[in-house]
């Protein structure tokens, strides 16, 4: 099956040129996006809902269209194919360069498909990114909605979760009262818009609760909050050791709760160009030891100075 997706030398040359073009801050042509999305779907449709991932690798949280900070992330973490990456979703919306960001992510996936895993986040969904910036950005940069439609079609093929060395469960949001076993994720039809409720929704929308046990109503209007007791039960039942997720702005770029068994990773520094937060990536070595690296925003011209402050609750 993998051989069907092997790139020819001509295709490798083309994708390398596209990666170089994107790194220079140029957008792809409409035809280049179309070809990229076709190839990406061929690769992604062969991936299961739960990706089994080997260490060593680097886990990254939300990017949200902050393209310069994504380039900085690769500078810090290492470029592909020298470093293996697992991204936890939310590549688009809010930031001003979602087009460049997701174009680069997909190009890297096509070029180094076994070295990078791209999970789906709650913003990889038409209903959300039509409101929070991605649709408008695509229209502004291409003059129509064709590219947006092509990208959003790819979103449905992104896997929903990953497990690192059969011990670390990874998803964008978190747990679900509808899930006792991770095997239930395998049964989901992921090639669709994110439902408003149920297991698929919760994987991408839920948040851990620091101070309360049990399940709670999420202030986001989708997903749930879950307590330390839920984490302990889930990990024990599935013979896992930790949960790694993204989805929430945390001011230090990383936060560990539930006896350090639930880890939130956020990789967009100075989120929305105004929150003043640090970002973080987490390297996991062969012994599953985690090494966190925090970083500040990449330098930009004409960007206002921001002071660190506790942010509003973001969707």
Curated annotation (Swiss-Prot):
Leucine methyl ester carried by residues: 315
A Pfam cross-reference name: Metallophos
Binding positions for Mn(2+) 2 per the UniProt entry: 90, 122, 172, 247
GO cellular component term, pick one: nucleus
Entries under SMART domains matching the protein: PP2Ac
Known EC number: 3.1.3.16
Record's cofactor remark: Binds 2 manganese ions per subunit.
GO molecular function (one): protein serine/threonine phosphatase activity
Cross-referenced PANTHER family: SERINE/THREONINE-PROTEIN PHOSPHATASE PP2A-RELATED
Name of the protein this chain belongs to: Serine/threonine-protein phosphatase PP2A catalytic subunit 2
């Amino acid at each position: 099956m993998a051989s069907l997706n092997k790139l020819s030398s001509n295709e490798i040359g083309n994708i390398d040129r596209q990666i170089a073009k994107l790194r220079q801050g140029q957008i792809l042509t409409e035809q280049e996006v179309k070809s990229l999305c076709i190839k990406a779907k061929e690769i992604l449709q062969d991936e299961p809902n739960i990706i089994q991932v080997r260490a060593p690798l680097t886990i990254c949280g939300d990017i949200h269209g902050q393209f310069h900070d994504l380039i900085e992330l690769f500078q810090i973490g290492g470029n592909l194919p020298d470093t293996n990456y697992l991204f936890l979703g939310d590549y688009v919306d809010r930031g001003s360069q979602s087009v460049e960001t997701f174009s680069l992510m997909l190009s890297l996936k096509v070029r180094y498909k076994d070295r990078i895993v791209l999970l789906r986040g709650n913003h990889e969904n038409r209903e959300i990114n039509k409101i929070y910036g991605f649709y408008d950005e695509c229209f502004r940069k291409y003059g129509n909605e064709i590219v947006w439609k092509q990208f959003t079609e790819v979103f449905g093929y992104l896997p929903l979760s990953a497990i690192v060395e059969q011990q670390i469960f990874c998803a964008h949001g978190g747990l679900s009262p509808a899930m006792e076993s991770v095997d239930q994720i395998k049964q989901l039809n992921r090639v669709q818009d994110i439902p408003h409720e149920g297991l698929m929704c919760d994987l991408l929308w839920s948040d851990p609760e620091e101070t309360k046990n049990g399940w709670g109503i999420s202030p986001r209007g989708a997903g749930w909050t879950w307590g330390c007791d839920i984490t302990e039960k889930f990990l024990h039942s599935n013979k896992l050791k930790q949960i790694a997720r993204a989805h929430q702005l945390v001011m230090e770029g990383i936060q560990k709760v539930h006896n350090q068994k639930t880890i939130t990773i956020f990789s967009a520094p100075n989120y929305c160009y105004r929150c003043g937060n640090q970002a973080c990536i987490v390297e996991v070595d062969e012994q599953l030891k985690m090494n966190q690296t925090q970083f500040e925003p990449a330098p930009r011209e004409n960007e206002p100075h921001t002071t660190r402050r506790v942010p509003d609750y973001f969707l």
